Amino acid sequence: MEFNKHEKQLYTVVIGFLVLFPVLCASTFTASRATYYGTPDGYGTPSGACGFGEYGRTVNNGYVSAVSRALYKDGAGCGACYQVRCKNPHLCTYDGVNIVVTDYGEGDRTDFILSPRAFSKLALPKADKKLMSYGVVEVEYKRISCNYYPTHHINNSVITYKISEHSNYPYYLALTILHVSGKNDITAVELWQKETNQWKAMRRVYGAVWDMANPPRGPITLRFQATTNLGYTYWVYSTNAIPKLWKAGAAYQAKVKLIIAK
């Protein structure tokens, strides 16, 4: 089949639109509202619904947030990063604040309940007290790639997870997924069972915490089901993701082939 000149031009325009459309959608801000919760030092809370503990209080320098059910996603949204900016130009900066999701919370038609540090970061210099006096503000937000983790680099493609202190070698294994590169949510975790030659699903306990009783002996191979912010779901694999003699409290990093969208 051959195209004439006008058909070729139209074809090029349509293909270009199909390529660029997901990028344009991904960079669009969504209107919402934000408020903040109180803490003694302005940082986050160690008791957040994601199960991060003390890590969830200080990660990203305390610029953290509880989010609505729609963004929490039954725990799959834990660790996601968003740019949030206030829509009052007289009180707020243009860039706003980049936050990490560490908790679940519903406010007055809000999608974000920010830590005090994060809410103050929305404000222009010397306008933070005025902004906080409002209590709730109109904002807009968009999903962004996470770049807060100490070992993160723009070209890295990693999943960072910690063996929960509640784990009991070798009878009970619980993992907390701390960081995922790009704009990916982890929606399933499975372990390879060498004895039965099949994958066995871990259970999402709550938030970012996954567990399994009687895990496989020896080095453990994991696979993670990731879902991008545009809804594409795929699996990534990590051989020997957890060593044979694993210990509670240890953290590991799986170098995997995640889709890293800008």
Where are these regions (language model features)?
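Folded extracytoplasmic luminal domains of secretory or organellar precursors
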Residues: 2-262
